[in-house]
UniProtKB/Swiss-Prot annotation:
Protein name, as recorded: Small ribosomal subunit protein uS2c
InterPro entries, A to Z: Ribosomal_uS2, Ribosomal_uS2_bac/mit/plastid, Ribosomal_uS2_CS, Ribosomal_uS2_flav_dom_sf
KW Cell division (keyword) present: no
CDD domains in UniProt: RPS2
Originating gene: rps2
Signal peptide region: none
Amino acid sequence: MTRRYWNINLKEMVEAGVHFGHGIKKWNPKMAPYISAKRKGTHIINLARTARFLSEACDLVFDAASQGKSFLIVGTKKRATDLVASAAIRARCHYVNKKWFSGMLTNWSITKTRLSQFRDLRAEEKMGKFQHLPKRDVAILKRKLSTLQRYLGGIKYMTRLPDIVIVLDQQKEYIALRECAILGIPTISLVDTNCDPDLANISIPANDDTMTSIRLILNKLVFAICEGHSLYIRNH
């Protein structure tokens, strides 16, 4: 894996609050190597470790993107939904930002069928086919289309399983991580002080509750993906 410089600096991470963990009573002992101190009843994350693993994650996604690999970003926390969508669109990644349905990856054949139905419905609406149907049927189809857009809109162009999955909240997206582990899909996950760093291939110790922290980490990863995509396009 190529090692590159990703302009990750401690001052920027401190300003974003990346170092703030959970209260000392809400911690996972496996996170001990990533904690540098306790302050006013709160664990403080060791940002040198954050920088190291974030850099490794950026190297991984850059190399994968430069080979034309596909990515899925998962973040269903309400406050992060818009951030997840905009970051994924910017980096041409698939994303899930509303709800993770159990079996979304492990029951891929079912997910693929739903995506096919979604694409067909969108095409029919665009071609004006709904205009020739009774109003009641149109209302039913539009409700179905709206639901599919809400929950599957971020993966509507996904035709196969992703090569790498990025998870923004380990505890909230635990099922997604388990599905990736079952399928052998490499994962990158933010891990706060109450998380298990062993659940992902690359765990980035960071505050996963504050938007500024999530945004900083995600932006670094997205920048690396975009750089990798650019290299792939130049070489092909």
